Amino acid sequence: MDSFELNKILGAVLGTCLILLVTSFTANALFSPKMPEKPGFEIAVKEDAGHGKEGGAAAAASEPIEKLLQTASVEKGAAAAKKCGACHTFEKGGPNRVGPNLYGVVGEARGEGRNGFNFSAAMKGKGGTWTFDDLNKFIANPKGFIPGTAMGFAGIPKDSERADVIAYLNSLSEHPKPLPTASK
């Protein structure tokens, strides 16, 4: 290869680089981006007033469960609880699935029993029994009521639907608990 051919190749490469450089400067001058003062996006989130003793679940219910249970329907609760059937069973002596069998859960100890179901450490650590109020908070926001629970369900936001499900769960027992009366 002689020097004339080499000069043509180097000239073409340098010319291409020069064209790219001029094009880049021109594009930046015409379309200069407006850089924000602080990089990223601000996401405005309302603070939840219920981040208290119960892990934020207290604010989930707008009405007391005692009042809601007065108008709750076991039949509607059975229909609404079908979505729970993907992970739970409801019949007496039924098998555990991803979640435990829920027959007779109202008034039972939290994180214990349930035919050998392996509860999460968070559920075992919470202790206590499943009261109507605790079930309401848990079904509204499982991870808010018991942070670290293995239950992946997001919760039931509608108060009346939760009350129906709780009334249904209460009916699943040989000795259902009396529904609490609404305090005035």
From Swiss-Prot:
Taxonomic source organism: Bradyrhizobium diazoefficiens (strain JCM 10833 / BCRC 13528 / IAM 13628 / NBRC 14792 / USDA 110)
Transmembrane segments: 11-31
Subcellular location: Cell membrane
An annotated GO cellular component: plasma membrane
Role description: May be involved in electron transfer from bc1 complex to aa3.
PTM section of the record: Binds 1 heme c group covalently per subunit.
Name of the molecule in the record: Cytochrome c homolog
GO MF: electron transfer activity; heme binding; metal ion binding
Periplasmic side: 32-184
Membrane topology: Single-pass type II membrane protein
Record flagged with keyword Nucleotidyltransferase: no
Family annotation (SUPFAM superfamilies): Cytochrome c
Cystine connections: none
Cytoplasmic domain ranges by topology: 1-10
Key words of the record: Cell membrane, Electron transport, Heme, Iron, Membrane, Metal-binding, Signal-anchor, Transmembrane, Transmembrane helix, Transport
Binding site for heme c: C84, C87, H88, M151
Membership in a protein family: Belongs to the cytochrome c family.
Keyword Cell membrane: yes
Main location: membrane
